[in-house]
Amino acid sequence: MRETKDLREKARQFLTILIPILITQAGLSLITVLDTVMSGKVSAADLAGVAIGSSLWTPVYTGLAGILTAVTPMVAQLMGAKRQKDVPYTVIQSIYVAGIISLAVIVSGYFLIDPVLENLDLERKVAVIAKQYLICIGLGILPLFVYNVMRCFIDSLGKTRVTMLITLCSLPINFVLNYLFIFGNFGFPKLGGAGAGLASAITYWCICLISLYIVHKKTPFHQFRIFGTFYSFSFAESMKLLKIGIPIGFAIFFETSIFAAVTLLMSHFDTVTIASHQAAMNFASLLYMLPLSVSMTLTIVVGFEAGAKRFKDSRAYSYLGISIAVGFSLFTALIILLFREQIAGLYAADRDVLLLTKDFLLYALFFQLSDAIAAPIQGALRGYKDVNYTLVTALVSYWIIGLPVGFVIGTYTSFGAFGYWIGLITGLAAGAVGLFFRLKRIQNRYIHTQSM
């Protein structure tokens, strides 16, 4: 990371950081896509089971991992303020927090999986597959959260290409493991949807160990000597992380759990509808990787500039990121319109699932446009360490506006399952508007304060 003088330099540095993050996010998303697609080749029940399992796991993981993303603005601002010596302490305390979070998830899951699944109106076979999937993926919870800390540290230094390479290594590992455990090839047990969870867990162990080795041994990370000094657990330092991380985590949880809630509310529909909904949602999640990557990039560059008190530069980066995300969303909207039948065909061989997935994809087109505005703004606000408003916005727009609208339309009109998607679009649009005005206010406040 370095100071930039004009828009061209900013664009060059922004893209240098963004492109590896985008590839990394797409790669991580492809792990879930591979789970879904390959499970769907076994049976519709396996596809639906993985869909339900993912819907329960994803909001929990993304919300708790969101707490750990506080590492990024904290380290970025330390680097901008030239306080490199404080970085190792922050990273180690974050690893302690990651371990505590992992233990809490494992213990909670042990007691809650059965009651939650029993209260869902699921076909017996689908419920069994969902439980097996969750148990298997739980074996990789600890390394996944530790990897998140390592990734945030690496990315906050602007070295996003490193995490990109780690992710690219993980894809063939996950594909091969899926091939072995889902289908039972080469003498391995045929586990179906559960095999997808086991494959992902093993993959998480691999990327965690690789990242730890790189941080410990490779330039420029080893010069920080992250593991060179033993630091005991500090409640005070952990609270600094949690003060920033908890609002981020809950905001992400409210956003991702709304999609999970919709899937669960749709559980009374038939297996074809659930499978089609999940297939379309998986593809929409893949498209979301660009605005999410822009968001993560903005947290790094805005945090760096804010730490250095260059607030006009941080504002310029914010609008650059939003422009890139919106431009890409318009392009992907065109792709969906032209190739939705081919996209649907990637997810299912069943004719009924394919036809219904095509219709769901049209709704995905609209809410990814709102994501292109909301996600980058969230990233910019996190760079300023302004996280509480994002939390409130997520709660109101998704749960107080989006979900009720979706439930009413989905339950009491002829739109049926599509009504829930209309609710999602409404919530995302409301959130985007609220976040935009917040960003303007924060930017003006910092610039005005600096000019006094």
UniProtKB/Swiss-Prot annotation:
The protein's GO terms of the molecular function aspect are: antiporter activity; xenobiotic transmembrane transporter activity
Q: Which UniProt keywords apply?
A: Antiport, Cell membrane, Ion transport, Membrane, Transmembrane, Transmembrane helix, Transport
- Looking at the record's lineage, which domain of life comes first? Bacteria
Subcellular location per UniProt equals: Cell membrane
The cross-references to Pfam families, in alphabetical order and at most eight, read: MatE
Kindly list any coiled-coil regions of this protein. Answer: none
> Where is the chain membrane-spanning?
12-34, 49-71, 91-113, 128-150, 162-184, 194-216, 245-267, 282-304, 317-339, 359-381, 388-410, 415-437
**Keyword field contains Transmembrane:** yes
One GO cellular component, as annotated: plasma membrane
What is a biological process (GO) this protein takes part in? monoatomic ion transport
Chief place where the protein resides: membrane
Membrane topology field: Multi-pass membrane protein
What the record says about family reads: Belongs to the multi antimicrobial extrusion (MATE) (TC 2.A.66.1) family.
Described by its record, this protein's role is as follows:
Multidrug efflux pump.
Q: Which PANTHER family match?
A: FMN_FAD EXPORTER YEEO-RELATED, MULTIDRUG RESISTANCE PROTEIN NORM-RELATED
- This chain's protein is named Probable multidrug resistance protein NorM
Q: Which source organism does the UniProt entry give?
A: Bacillus licheniformis (strain ATCC 14580 / DSM 13 / JCM 2505 / CCUG 7422 / NBRC 12200 / NCIMB 9375 / NCTC 10341 / NRRL NRS-1264 / Gibson 46)
